[in-house]
Amino acid sequence: MNRILMLCLAFLAIGQTHAQTKTAAMDVAYRRSSLYKMMIDDPSRQYADVIKNSFVQGPNQDKFNEHNLVIRTIPATDAKDESANIIAFIEANNIARDIVAKWFDRSPKGGFDMKLIQTRGSYDASDLDISKAKMSKRGTAMLADAGEDLIKNTFILVNDFKYVSKEEVAEKTKMALGGLSKIGGSLGVSSSLTGASSEALTVAGKGYVVKTTAHLFRLVWNEETAAIFYNDYWADDATITPERKKAFEDSKIFKLEYVGSDVSWADVQSSSFTQKTNEQLIERATNKAVDAVIVKLQKEHDEFKTKTPLFSGEPITAKIGMKEGLTDKSKFDVMEQQQDADGKIQYVSVGSVKVDDSFPIWDNRYGAQDENPDSKIDRTYFKKVSGKDFYRGMLIVQKKGK
């Protein structure tokens, strides 16, 4: 009897170990792009302090690694287009260099380490020992992989916000169009805000339409830049010299490249019975505007798209929703992480899915919980279009323009 009991316990232990291994595999870590958010600061605008505080203290984009520097605002100029001002500010303040410094945890002494890259890339610490890595094929591959998959995918998003109350929009529309029966875009607003309805004007006094013009940049990190950094600037705190410290501080090799710009509107709904103050409405509008313009930029620029892990494989679900711009027509490629002989991560397409319109799309937009406190929806459901079995931890990437 004791022997039988021991055998049963042994099989049970094996089963538990297998289940734990499978769960660990399903919860595989994945690499995110990194995002540094800035804004144009114009103190002359109404609620300037509220606008700035709402942006600076707002939530991070959960599909990106946060890579903000201390500098979050760029002083506005009198120009209608702030593009030239943004570029001049970035260059004068060595933003690209300081982004690299943050990647390598530069200390006050001037030394670097690989801790942040190790964490974000899920690397083994020994693989990223610089002194050893440069002397082995695998180590060199790991450094190249870190640059290609992590450092290179660092983006800078500069927002220029303009705030207009719904009441002001409605009044200007009424004057411009000669009545509420006409719906138009001559003021640059959506038709939902200019409808021929006296009820719309009744609630227009509370709530803001937010226009953000966003400019997207990307850190330039290529083989040449990496070689100069590792050969001429790299040193940890134990080996740093005044010459290397100064060489990095004086360096002009680090650059940002322009990706694109886009404009988006964010509408903060309100009602006659709202208890929210103007400051709270502006705070919500700021964050919703950022989410909205990121969605537009991602649809036009594949390199800016984020990966999202499947939350479950059967049914197929993911923690993604309206904040990411999902509609019932949204389609995604399903990607699987694979590691080659040198340890480099590759993403291979293994199928595709589309939003399952028999379920509601998760409303995860900023403030949605306040508007729908009883909602139990916390994920979006998908249908398989092609591919075999999918499992938790596989990554989905939205198809271009979808």
Describe each region flagged by the PLM.
Residues 4-13:
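Sec-dependent N-terminal signal peptides
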Residues 14-19:
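Sec/Tat signal peptide C-region and signal peptidase I cleavage site
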Residues 20-402:
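Surface-exposed, polar/charged interaction patches used for macromolecular assembly or partner binding
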